[in-house]
Amino acid sequence: IGIYANTDNGLERVDYVETDISGERTDVPDLVGRPRRDVVLLNDGDLTFAKVRLDEMSRNTLVNGIDRLADPLARAVTWSLFWDSVRDAEIAPQELVSLALQGIGSEKDMAAITTVLAQAAVCSGRFMAPELREAANMKLVTGLAGLLKDAEPGSDAQLIIAKTLIG
């Protein structure tokens, strides 16, 4: 379990507790009495296959600042849990589209950029209710155009964004 706090350098891990999960609920005595931080991330370090969900405070922090999450592996776990949440119909597909457009511009991992933008395209084109699809596609195209404009010229990120934009 990674504990993250907002700092001048972004969302940084300030504590880590190894825990074995057994059953539907597991007490974590090592965290009792410690101050609540901005993000509590289960499966931090991606040590096992697990469907992870966020508590409300962690979710709100990451929705408004996934790009501030300093650790690339923690970001990958976070991107994955948001995708799982869409596939399990726990969050709306347009939320993942918005999150991708807001957070992917500062992502440095090309695999993450490729995966997240592909997932945003799936959300916009297939997972969206038919009556919302046109607006979602317009939002995605407009957002991708902005990301393309802001990307470093000739970079891998620019190429990935361009490929996503043209489908």
Language model: regions and residue ranges:
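Non-catalytic accessory/interaction domains
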Residues: 1-167
